[in-house]
């Protein structure tokens, strides 16, 4: 076995005389490896051999030797004897081929300029082997030759500065740089059908075609015109543009799936550097992929770190779809074509707007596969702003890799584990690859499962096409298909091992092997991971239909009583989304299971506590006075229960600070017990709080110590791509940790570049800001330059790092450098602040973002006026440096604000009249020159929830733009979801015991519910809503040099849920 050495740039070019002598020499055995191929089930069984060669001249032996070689090799032979037999056969084959090549080279040598040193480009030679006959040989042979000036003292320098169009990019590359070059594999004494299906793509034949130009942008158009299946790596390993041509679609898909496995291993190799290996091996193909292939392509590119629990309340897509259809039928009535895809009869799964003419709006894609995901949109073309009722779509100027027509932008983050054992890694990858329908050509009997409905995933898809010119849905077709998973013992064993480790299930007998569909791998393990006492406990982010499916699946065909399985889960549910559905499913599976809910403040606490050996949910619904008065008694009950349970949920309606500290201290003092703060549910009090505690035990059944990194939680995440980078960089790969660098990052970046570098600079700036100023100018030599600058937008920076689109070379220095004279946001030490101070950080950032959007959309050069209602001390003055800033407040004006202050108050019963009066006072002619800001003034000025709603309705009727930063009361679970989604059966939450979830709780001041506030503005197409999470606020706090206090960590999730910013543009 040789040590793999990657070639350098110079290794790909050898002088023509040396090249000829190499063809006359025998096959070099020192760069060759022959590896035994063994079956997974029986490692002692050898079914063939794998031949690889680490020599640039022989990287591609398939044109010479074919896809496989049949030799008579005695298994008892030693390695050296086996190699001798193979080399003898290969030399005989190469001798004939090389003789033909030498004769052709002699016949075409007249075309070589003898005044220069001819060099041979080896990648072109590999392609030349595919066309041994035909007139194309002569022309390609001439392209293979690089002429180097013989008078040049340094031939290498002349080579790098050659004017040949194929090598125009070489002047940007270090000649000693290593280039990852793929090894071509040839089977010996085996066929592709003998190879495991996840490795067949390693041996499929393909041709490498080099473009006769250095323009990579022509590659898409080139492969689109050819009839054969073709594809290319978006990040090539060599600088010359090239693509791969396959014999059939089956070969291309086999190669695609093999590269998916390699990508999975590269991405999760923690020791590999970015330059040592190409992390993303996937191909961009010239034919549409099945949806499952596209999903697989994204799935394998995600790393597997254990993520923290996050709760996302997201808007439904129905209003978005209506808005897009309206937009298409009005703004693009003559050009737009809308394609609609419904998956499993969800409200909307996919919508695409495309134009038939000039690409003013080439494509907008929206995906929703679970009805509970964050929805984004990606455009291919110029910047387009589309305002929807609930801001469900953010349009980004991005061009992402098209792995298929229906590429899901978001997929579950519960993925297969990364284990120390290579055997289990092979298991996990086999299951990942099995989600796709395998090509028929290489299906063999032992891989083809029986057609059993219970083991298949039924997917019903409805395609519709809407033509706005006629106003009707032009076509409609339905398709139902079943995805079958190969039923082999290793797939089953892997599932059983994970479920046993997470949930304590016993081994399943081989004869009763259940054939699980792939959702058990993606969801079943996530569910088991969540409810395992040794890990993070109950799941909060799963949809009920998924939980129902998993519960029914894991109890099918298992030689364990259902009641015993359920009892192992120890589900004690209350105050959990979809709790009624879970309870219903548990009782449907086993009617005798006792799903117990308890409160520590009932008459039978101690009796209940004796049986609480698993998980318990506790609700503390007494007043603060009672908590203080009976603190010792309550803590006694509380400690009794904690001694018996492995973990649970504690919900405080209105926690008393002293009692809360006692509870948290008691939880933390227990050995091996951890406490986390969750976003609160089912409460109208702004101070309600939910704690999650669990015992961090070690299960002896766990196969590896880091099993917690196996399966991440069920979350949905969007990943956008650029055309030049197909990998998905994670946050820590993109920029250093926010906690260490953000507080010292410069406030603005600028660039000066030529036109060729402009796309890179704009791409970099777009990851840190939503707006930039760019200008072009010509120097004294007549060379055009481009310059620009962008101020960092913290929210955009967070979006970029979260969605994975931030380039790894941002900021690009010295091409993009910090602007001189711009103050740095530096702070030597962190300042500890409370939750209210942290929550107030986000409001100004939202307001500034909306102001920048408003400024960018204005075409008038008139003065911009910002009117801050209730601003008082002018704290927001710094957000609008290029606008006339005026404060409306009845309080006395500060000394520095006297010249920009109006003491006559705003009339909240007559918004239009107040606006007209202020415009007359300031001499403003057009209301579109006005930007209104209401920063928390609604809370103090409006004393009834109905008044809030009325104020928003009036605000929406004004002709100016406005931003309202306010608070809403926490809604009950069903009310909260109703403000975002339609009342679909699987999203409604009906708790069984209403005593634990009353709809009203005491509130310190009257606030409207989120649903009431949304109802006031959802009918206004100009409005959008901003809301953030505690994690994002903590990131921003680190950037500005703030650290949360202990009380802030406890109460921040609840306060974040209250804080909301409405914008009307």
UniProtKB/Swiss-Prot annotation:
<keyword id="KW-0808">Transferase</keyword>
<keyword id="KW-0067">ATP-binding</keyword>
<dbReference type="Pfam" id="PF18965">
    <property type="entry name" value="VP3-like"/>
</dbReference>
<dbReference type="GO" id="GO:0019028">
    <property type="term" value="C:viral capsid"/>
</dbReference>
<dbReference type="GO" id="GO:0005524">
    <property type="term" value="F:ATP binding"/>
</dbReference>
<keyword id="KW-0167">Capsid protein</keyword>
<keyword id="KW-0506">mRNA capping</keyword>
<keyword id="KW-0511">Multifunctional enzyme</keyword>
<keyword id="KW-0489">Methyltransferase</keyword>
<keyword id="KW-0547">Nucleotide-binding</keyword>
<keyword id="KW-0946">Virion</keyword>
<comment type="function">
    <text>Outer capsid protein involved in mRNA capping. Catalyzes the last 3 enzymatic activities for formation of the 5' cap structure on the viral plus-strand transcripts, namely the RNA guanylyltransferase, RNA-7N- and RNA-2'O-methyltransferase activities.</text>
</comment>
<dbReference type="GO" id="GO:0004482">
    <property type="term" value="F:mRNA 5'-cap (guanine-N7-)-methyltransferase activity"/>
</dbReference>
<keyword id="KW-0548">Nucleotidyltransferase</keyword>
<dbReference type="InterPro" id="IPR045917">
    <property type="entry name" value="VP3-like"/>
</dbReference>
<keyword id="KW-0507">mRNA processing</keyword>
<dbReference type="GO" id="GO:0005525">
    <property type="term" value="F:GTP binding"/>
</dbReference>
<keyword id="KW-0949">S-adenosyl-L-methionine</keyword>
<dbReference type="GO" id="GO:0004484">
    <property type="term" value="F:mRNA guanylyltransferase activity"/>
</dbReference>
<keyword id="KW-0342">GTP-binding</keyword>
<protein>
    <recommendedName>
        <fullName>Outer capsid protein VP3</fullName>
        <ecNumber>2.7.7.50</ecNumber>
        <ecNumber>2.1.1.56</ecNumber>
    </recommendedName>
</protein>
């Amino acid at each position: 076995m040789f040590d793999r050495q990657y070639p350098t740039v110079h290794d790909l070019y050898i002088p023509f005389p040396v090249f000829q002598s190499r063809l006359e020499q025998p096959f070099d055995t020192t760069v060759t490896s022959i590896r035994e191929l063994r079956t997974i089930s029986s490692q002692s069984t050898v079914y063939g051999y794998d031949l690889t060669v680490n020599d640039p001249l022989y990287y591609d032996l398939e044109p010479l030797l074919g896809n496989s070689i049949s030799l008579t090799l005695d298994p008892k032979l030693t390695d050296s004897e086996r190699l001798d037999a193979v080399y003898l056969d290969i030399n005989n084959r190469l001798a004939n081929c090389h003789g033909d090549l030498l004769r052709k080279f002699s016949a075409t040598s007249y075309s070589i300029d003898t005044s220069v040193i001819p060099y041979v480009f080896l990648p072109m030679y590999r392609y030349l082997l595919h066309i041994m006959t035909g007139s194309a040989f002569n022309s390609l042979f001439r392209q293979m030759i690089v002429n180097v000036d013989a008078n040049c003292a340094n031939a290498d320098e002349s080579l790098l500065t050659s004017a040949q169009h194929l090598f125009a990019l070489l002047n940007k590359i270090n000649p000693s740089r290593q280039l990852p070059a793929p090894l071509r594999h040839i089977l010996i004494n085996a066929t592709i059908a003998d190879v495991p299906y996840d490795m067949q793509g390693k041996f499929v034949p393909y041709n490498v075609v080099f473009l006769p130009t250095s323009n990579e942008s022509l590659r898409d158009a080139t492969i689109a015109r050819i009839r054969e299946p073709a594809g290319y790596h978006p990040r090539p390993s060599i600088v010359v543009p090239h693509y791969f041509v396959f014999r059939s679609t089956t070969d291309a898909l086999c190669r695609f799936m093999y590269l998916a496995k390699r990508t999975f291993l590269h991405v999760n190799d923690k020791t590999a550097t970015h330059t040592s290996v190409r992390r993303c091996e996937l191909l961009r193909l010239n034919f549409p992929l099945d949806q499952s292939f596209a999903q697989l392509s994204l799935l394998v590119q995600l790393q597997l770190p254990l993520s923290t629990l996050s709760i996302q309340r997201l808007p439904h897509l129905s209003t978005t779809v209506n808005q897009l259809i309206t937009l298409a039928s009005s703004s693009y009535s003559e050009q737009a074509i809308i394609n609609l895809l419904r998956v499993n009869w969800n409200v909307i799964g996919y919508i695409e707007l495309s134009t038939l003419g000039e690409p003013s709006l080439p494509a907008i894609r929206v995906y929703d596969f679970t009805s509970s995901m964050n929805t984004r949109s990606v455009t291919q073309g110029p910047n387009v702003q589309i305002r929807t009722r609930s801001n469900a779509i953010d349009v980004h100027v991005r061009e992402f890799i098209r792995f298929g027509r229906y590429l899901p932008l978001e997929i579950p983050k519960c993925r297969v584990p990364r284990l120390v054992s290579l055997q289990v890694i092979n298991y996990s990858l086999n299951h990942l690859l099995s989600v796709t329908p395998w090509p028929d050509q290489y299906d063999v009997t032992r891989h083809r499962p029986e057609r059993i409905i219970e083991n298949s995933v039924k997917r019903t898809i409805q395609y519709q096409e809407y033509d706005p010119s006629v106003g009707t849905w032009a076509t409609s077709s339905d398709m139902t298909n079943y995805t079958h998973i190969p039923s082999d013992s290793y797939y089953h064993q892997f599932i059983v091992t994970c479920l046993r480790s997470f949930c304590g299930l016993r081994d399943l007998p081989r004869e009763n092997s259940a054939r699980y569909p792939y959702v058990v791998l993606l969801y079943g393990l996530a569910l088991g991971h969540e409810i395992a006492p040794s890990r993070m406990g109950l799941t909060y982010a799963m949809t009920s239909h998924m939980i129902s499916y998993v519960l029914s699946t894991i109890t099918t065909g298992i030689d364990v009583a259902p009641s015993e399985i359920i009892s192992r889960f120890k589900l004690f549910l209350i105050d959990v989304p979809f709790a009624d559905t879970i309870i219903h499913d548990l009782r449907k599976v086993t009617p005798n299971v006792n799903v117990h809910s308890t409160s520590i403040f009932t008459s039978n606490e101690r009796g209940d506590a004796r049986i609480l050996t698993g998980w318990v949910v506790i609700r503390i619904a007494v007043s603060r006075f009672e908590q203080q008065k009976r603190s010792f008694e309550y803590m006694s009950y509380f400690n009794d229960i904690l001694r018996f349970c492995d973990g649970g949920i504690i919900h405080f309606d209105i926690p008393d600070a002293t009692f809360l500290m006692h509870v948290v201290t008691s939880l933390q003092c227990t050995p091996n017990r951890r406490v986390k703060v969750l976003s609160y549910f089912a409460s109208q009090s702004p101070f309600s709080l939910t704690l999650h505690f669990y015992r961090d035990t070690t299960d002896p059944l766990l196969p590896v110590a880091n099993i917690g990194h196996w399966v991440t939680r069920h979350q949905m995440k969007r990943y956008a791509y650029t055309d030049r980078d197909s990998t998905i960089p994670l946050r820590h790969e993109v920029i250093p940790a926010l906690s260490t660098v953000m507080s010292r990052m410069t406030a603005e970046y600028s660039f000066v570049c030529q036109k060729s570098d402009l796309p890179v600079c704009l791409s970099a700036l777009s990851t840190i800001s939503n707006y930039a100023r760019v200008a072009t100018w010509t120097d004294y030599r007549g060379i055009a330059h481009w310059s620009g600058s962008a101020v960092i937008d913290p929210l955009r920076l967070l979006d970029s790092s979260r969605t994975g689109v931030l380039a790894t070379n941002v900021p690009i220095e010295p091409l993009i450098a910090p602007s001189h004279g711009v103050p740095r946001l530096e702070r030597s030490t962190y300042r500890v602040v409370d939750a209210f101070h942290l929550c107030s950080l986000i409001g100004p950032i939202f307001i500034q973002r909306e102001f920048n959007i408003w400024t960018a959309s204005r075409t008038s050069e008139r003065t911009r006026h910002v009117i801050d209602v209730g601003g008082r001390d002018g704290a927001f003055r710094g957000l609008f440096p290029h606008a006339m800033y005026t404060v409306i407040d009845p309080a006395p004006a500060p000394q520095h604000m006297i010249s920009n202050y109006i003491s006559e108050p705003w009339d909240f019963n007559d918004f239009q009249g107040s606006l007209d009066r202020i415009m007359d006072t300031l001499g403003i002619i057009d209301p579109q020159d006005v930007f209104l800001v209401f920063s928390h003034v609604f809370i103090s000025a409006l004393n009834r929830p109905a008044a809030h709603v009325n104020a928003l309705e009036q605000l929406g009727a004004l002709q100016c733009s406005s931003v309202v930063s306010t608070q809403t009361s926490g809604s009950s679970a069903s009310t909260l979801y109703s403000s975002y989604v339609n009342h679909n059966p699987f999203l409604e939450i009906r708790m069984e015991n209403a005593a634990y979830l009353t709809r009203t709780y005491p509130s310190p001041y009257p606030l409207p519910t989120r649903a009431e506030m949304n109802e006031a503005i959802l009918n206004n197409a100009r409005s959008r809503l901003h809301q953030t999470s505690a994690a994002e606020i903590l990131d921003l706090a680190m950037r500005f040099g703030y650290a949360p206090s202990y009380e802030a960590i406890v109460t921040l999730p609840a306060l974040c849920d209250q804080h909301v910013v409405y914008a009307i543009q």
